[in-house]
């Protein structure tokens, strides 16, 4: 039985990761186009190129983590070693040097690539930790819930407070230089908090599950085993598709409110002396609704199974996303209502995915004798990165295709394109995700059989 403090400690890790992840997803595109002055198409291409490399880098980290041996375990040490680099490179990513447009684009390539690599280097071991904290599927389901609740709490805090901090540090000035300073200082605050949370995760967690045999196989053997793991392939496709859905919606939200809703025409909402813009509230409401989805995932999956819960949630999100296109700019109540229900559906699927990845490690151990926890969980990060890369690249390219020009009034064609980013395009991702998960073979009954068999083998090995 895992103690409450350890569950909370594990949640701290994804709280830290998600603060940066959501800020990148929601604000990095518009930061590059409207604050740093880079062309939208160039940014889209950069996202795709850097994320493709980063997706390849994830399994390298997973293999290295599987072979790491320290007094702290295989995966926890990475939280200790990389918390500060994670924070520091995050700050560099949101800095705005003056190297000319070509030089600035090169700077963006370098800092963004480094950021995604250090994200992988800390997040892949963190995700893998989930698979070795307990051998019991019910414990891992609980850990998935804690992980995602804290992830969405972190996202909620970051999305709610980031733009108010930008305005505070910029002195409420609209001058570009002041805005650039505000963005950098706001990310400094978030980065410090992320480092503290990673240290908390390291201190409060413990690795318990040992493989039946120590890691002796070669990288070639590990990759061969992975490529023959059918559930892994299915989850990879489902994860990529789900992240395309999320990344397009998140990346286009600020454009939607800035250029279609014209949020400047509305008075900012003030709470406790802090002023919030509509786009920030919209994103934060989505994160709060995600938490509801996470909480509902466990009881729903216990009743009808993980697979049915996942498919049902994504199908509902598909229908609501398509209907979103026809909402008018004056339908703010409906826009926020749709955001709540779409986000509840989106929130419910990710704890299910993490739990399914943990099941894949058991399946791998049963079939090959090799858990390859880090390598398998690296695919979860890989699917995140690759799905996000595809989604943001599509956003950048289509913004250019529809004639987007930063900080000007947009044409009707551009506005129609921006509306598609929150409707038809995300729906494609949800539908593809449902198609993939329909073929997932590890039912609850099957996993009980696998768990019992592995427990017997572990006892025999330890005798």
Q: Where are each of the predicted segments found?
A:
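Membrane-embedded alpha-helical bundles of multi-pass transporters/translocases
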Residues: 1-463
